[in-house]
């Protein structure tokens, strides 16, 4: 018996070593450029439009500027940047982002993260953490060109990118996080960055692609319904590296966090509410400059979109009050406040 136990123990040790030394997905390190080629705002808008035309996008998924005053197109005291979540584009936050920008007289940049909105069934095949981060950095740079101060709004993985930016840019005036992706509900995604992660995912998914069949056609226009598993590996890599207590402590800006939670049976089923709440407590933001609000009527992970949310009014009102009372944004009336 002792000899058998020794043999079994040895076999398990060999298997464990084989697993630990197994292949991990490697990303090429080639940071994309984030600097803006132009400073003139009208030319900047044209440059964005021309770049988006070449990207191979589904209709109406382009990144764009929504001007506080489209007849003048000038810099405003405050601009807003919206960063959508994994696989989504600007409609994921519509109409909340537009209503907030209009209410406060802000130029608004609706960003499109790297490889989002593509027509290609291989969307995300070329996505890397460096490219994902660079697209967020570029969005912030555009926001700075549009306003003297910048408020960044992010949903889900866009919230993750918003926190990433906040950790590195203390000059950001404020943060709005809707259902931020700190960890996904399904713990299996954590295997994506472990040894044999890509191989395991291919076996589970029976291939290299994820297909989503639950979206109605109008929503599917603004969300990817088929994408390469490399996107999930990129997402989990970002979560592993940047959604940590040490990184959260670097965030000092005023912060609003909204999420769907009614009770244990009725809550966000996509990203972890528990992880969000833990992150909230670990922020470097002072208690009087941050606010968390559960929206039990939202009913869905995406709480700020007309496609999904059951409580758009509640989400808008709570966010508007925070921006007014905590960040001290001033609503406009009549003529728009511009620089």
Annotated model-derived regions:
Residues 58-113:
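Short, surface-exposed "cap/lid" segments of acyl-processing enzymes
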Residues 153-162:
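Gly/Ala-rich beta-loop-alpha elbow adjacent to hydrolase catalytic centers
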Residues 112-117, 181, 298:
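Short beta-to-alpha linker loops that shape the active-site pocket of alpha/beta-hydrolase fold enzymes
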Residues 5-21:
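Hydrophobic membrane-insertion alpha-helices, especially the h-region
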Residues 32-62, 180-247, 293-295, 303-315:
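The alpha/beta-hydrolase serine catalytic core
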Residues 68-74, 220-299, 313-324, 330, ...:
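Serine-hydrolase catalytic core
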Residues 118-146:
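Catalytic nucleophile-loop/oxyanion-hole region of alpha/beta-hydrolase
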